[in-house]
Amino acid sequence: MSDVEEAVEEYEEQEEAAEEEHEEAVEEEAGGEAEAGEPCTAEDGEEEEGREAEDGPVEEFKPKPRPFMPNLVPPKIPDGERVDFDDIHRKRMEKDLNELQTLIEAHFENRKKEEEELVSLKDRIEKRRAERAEQQRIRAEREKERQTRLAEERARREEEESRRKAEDEARKKKALSNMMHFGGYIQKAQTERKSGKRQTEREKKKKILAERRKVLAIDHLNEDQLREKAKELWQMIYDLEAEKFDLQEKFKQQKYEINVLRNRINDNQKVSKTRGKAKVTGRWK
């Protein structure tokens, strides 16, 4: 049952109850007026007096108590207009249908927005995944290049170390061969005696740098040979800088380890001192 039918039934029940109460009120008023409005003639008065004398005193008339009920006033319908309940029901159904259609359209719009957001989210995830894979690939390539470069530098350093050792061995052999000749030994002793003092570290450094420094003979080189020479010098500088960086890192690590060991030694000394004091105090006690 729809809301319109329920409203119509309630309205009809209220109208019937109001009509019944109105009829009861009209009947009661009509009965009271008939009793109070009858003319009293002389004969009637004499007859009533005779009856009163015969029958005794007549009880006074008491009005019937009326139940307390508010008067329900039915709604007034203007003349010439009729209420079409079918039209009201039809309008109500059209309104409900419009609301339902609005809700359905809103639901589908929200669902469409959610699907679009889901698609965009998936696209962002795929894009981010591709970017991450590309970054990992680039990082792996860079790591591979770094490992290759480190391996090449390590091999180069080992080669230089072996070459340096070979040169040192050759120099030692040459010195031993020179020392075997007595004259050469005397000459060396005389030169040392003439110098009168030992070489300082700075002089030794200058001497070593002078030995390592080579003269660049580039006057007879053409353009391609100059480019190759420049590349060779650049590679040498690069290798020296790499070796310098490795030595600096090694120095930092050794310095850190020295500080850690020093702190451990200090802590151990403090602990040993406190233990010794505790033993002494316990002994004296």
UniProtKB/Swiss-Prot annotation:
Residues 111-171, 190-206 have a biased composition (Basic and acidic residues). Residues 66-77 have a biased composition (Pro residues). GO terms for cellular component: troponin complex. The modification Phosphoserine is found at S2, S195. The modification N-acetylserine is found at S2. One of its GO terms (molecular function) is troponin I binding. Pfam families: Troponin. It comes from the Eukaryota. The keyword Chaperone does not apply. The modification Phosphothreonine is found at T191, T200, T281. Residues 1-58 have a biased composition (Acidic residues). Troponin T is the tropomyosin-binding subunit of troponin, the thin filament regulatory complex which confers calcium-sensitivity to striated muscle actomyosin ATPase activity. Belongs to the troponin T family. This is Troponin T, cardiac muscle. It comes from Bos taurus. The gene is TNNT2.
